[in-house]
């Protein structure tokens, strides 16, 4: 007997549609799949966000996109402009990459100011922000300091990875991030969560969201375990997460 309800897991998933090779047809079918499986959000290439938001209107699935993606090296001004454009285009949740170079350099004032400026404009518009650390490049001391900064700035989520670095979410990182983030900050796993068992494991560690491209496989298995009918829909490839 499963110890979860369907929406406990479906509403964890941010369905990832970020690979640069996805065509318009791929993106549209991916959005349709996300709606059918009742996920939390679709995280889509920024240029397609306006169409995505229109398709998602009234479905209960949120539109999200990326800022400073995937390496975080954009200037603060560019990241703010990206965020403003995304919000104008209907974005409800922004996945923002920190300046990894500044984190590794110990430029904490720069890092805090940048996160703060983008968080402020996001919250002023009534939307939410997820701050991506890209943990595969960081030491624990960096991750802990980022959690402290994000707690102070009242960001909505701290997120492990872009899914495009040298590694994705690890159980140790999720424990660390949950331990060092305030109660007001949620944790998102990204990269490497490709089956239902792993999704349930990250949920048990306190992650409330998970970036995923294997949505149909994971939620198809959940529906099977819960005795729910299968969803007959296919979407063309979205690899990366």
From Swiss-Prot:
One of its GO terms (cellular component) is cytoplasm. Pathway: Carbohydrate degradation; 2-deoxy-D-ribose 1-phosphate degradation; D-glyceraldehyde 3-phosphate and acetaldehyde from 2-deoxy-alpha-D-ribose 1-phosphate: step 2/2. InterPro entries: Aldolase_TIM, DeoC, DeoC/FbaB/LacD_aldolase, DeoC_typeI. It comes from Rhodopirellula baltica (strain DSM 10527 / NCIMB 13988 / SH1). The keyword Calcium does not apply. HAMAP family: DeoC_type1. This is Deoxyribose-phosphate aldolase. Catalyzes a reversible aldol reaction between acetaldehyde and D-glyceraldehyde 3-phosphate to generate 2-deoxy-D-ribose 5-phosphate. One of its GO terms (biological process) is 2-deoxyribose 1-phosphate catabolic process. The active site is at residues 95, 159, 188. Its EC number is 4.1.2.4.
